Amino acid sequence: MASFDFIDEVKKYVQAGHGGPGVVHFRREKFVPKGGPDGGDGGKGGDIILKGNKQLSTLLHLKYRKHIVAEDGKSGEGGCRTGADGTSIILEVPLGTVAKDIDSGNILVDITEDGQQTILLHGGRGGQGNVHFKTPTQQAPRHAQPGESGEEGWIKLELKLLAEVGLVGFPNAGKSTLLASISAAKPKIANYPFTTLVPQLGVVAYREGHSFVLADMPGIIEGASMGKGLGTRFLKHIERNRVLVLMISADDTANIVQTYTSLLKELKSYSEDLFKKPRILVISKLDLIGAEEKVTIKKLLPKQIDCVFISSVTGEGLQKFKDKIWKLLHPELK
C-alpha cells in the first residue's frame, strides 16, 4: 500500500437525524361531528453507526467525505399514524478503529470485530402527536411535540492496527527483511532509512497449524515520542500489540547498548503501558558479523535481557525467534 493511501486518522463533523414532529390532527368521520384528536407521533431520526469490515485497511474512503448527516424522522400523520424513521448512516471502518470525541478525548466506540455494529450517535426521538394530550378537561388539544434533536459533534476516527506482535527499531534495523522472510508479506526493502513508510502486517505460520500476526512499523528516531520523524503517528499502532520485538542491527556492535536504551526511552516517554509490555530483543543481520563479535555483543548486554540472534538472509535463529514469541504470547503453556 502506498503511503498516501494509508490514512489512519480522519476528523469529521457528524450529526444524527432529528426526530420528526408530532402532528395536530382530528378525526374526520362521517356522522361523527366531534371527532377526537388522532395526531400521530413523529418518526425517529437516523443513527450514525460504525461497522467493522475486515477487508478495509485504511480510512482513506472517509478522508474526503464532507459532513456526515443522517436523515431526519418524518412528521406524524392523522389516524394515529407514526411518521417514518430517518435512514441511518453506516460507516464501514477497518478493524482496530476507535472513535473519539474531539473536545474531551473520550473513546466513544472501539471496533475490533468483523461485522460489529455500534451506534456512534443516536438519532432524536420523534415528538408526540396531539392524541397523547387529550384530558377530561381538554378534549381537543391543539398542540403536539416537536422531535428531539439528534446527537452531533466533531469526532476523530483513529486506526490502531490489530497485530499481536510489533517490530520496533531505528531505521535499517532489518525489520522489513524479517517480516518478508517469515510471512507472505511483501514490504519494500532497500538499504536506506525510512524504506517503510506505513505499517505492514504479515501472518507468521507456527508449529501445528498455529500462527500469529506480526506488524512491521516504520523506523523511529530519537524523539519519536515527542513527534519527531514519523513520531507518534505510528507509535500508537503498537498500543494494541501484546508483545514487542526491539530490533537492533548486529553490524553496529559498539552502540548496541546505547541503541537498546534509546528504544526503551522512546517507549517509556510515549506510554508507561508500552514500556511494561512483554518484549524481546532481537539482534539482526547475524550473517554480517563473526563469532567473536557475537560473543562481544553478549558480554555488552545485561544478562537479564532476553535476546536472540537472527539472520533473515540465512534463516539462522528464526525458529528460535518464533518459539520465544509464541511463549510470550501464551505464557500459560510454559
Curated annotation (Swiss-Prot):
Q: Name the species this protein comes from.
A: Amoebophilus asiaticus (strain 5a2)
Annotated localization:
Cytoplasm
Main subcellular localisation: cytoplasm
Q: Which function does this protein serve?
A: An essential GTPase which binds GTP, GDP and possibly (p)ppGpp with moderate affinity, with high nucleotide exchange rates and a fairly low GTP hydrolysis rate. Plays a role in control of the cell cycle, stress response, ribosome biogenesis and in those bacteria that undergo differentiation, in morphogenesis control.
A GO molecular function annotation here is: magnesium ion binding
Q: What is its EC number?
A: 3.6.5.-
What range(s) does the Obg domain occupy? 4-162
The UniProt record gives the binding positions of GTP as: 169-176, 194-198, 216-219, 284-287, 311-313
Residue positions annotated to bind Mg(2+) are S176, T196
Gene3D superfamilies with a match to the protein in the record: GTP1/OBG domain (2.70.210.12), P-loop containing nucleotide triphosphate hydrolases (3.40.50.300)
Q: Which UniProt keywords apply?
A: Cytoplasm, GTP-binding, Hydrolase, Magnesium, Metal-binding, Nucleotide-binding
Give all residue intervals belonging to the OBG-type G domain: 163-330
Protein family per UniProt = Belongs to the TRAFAC class OBG-HflX-like GTPase superfamily. OBG GTPase family.
Q: Might you name a Gene Ontology BP term for this protein? A: ribosome biogenesis
What domain of life does the UniProt record list for this protein's source? Bacteria
GO CC aspect terms: cytoplasm
Cofactor names: Mg(2+)
Q: How does it assemble?
A: Monomer.
UniProt-listed PROSITE patterns: G_OBG, GTP1_OBG, OBG
Kindly provide the name given to this protein in its UniProt entry: GTPase Obg
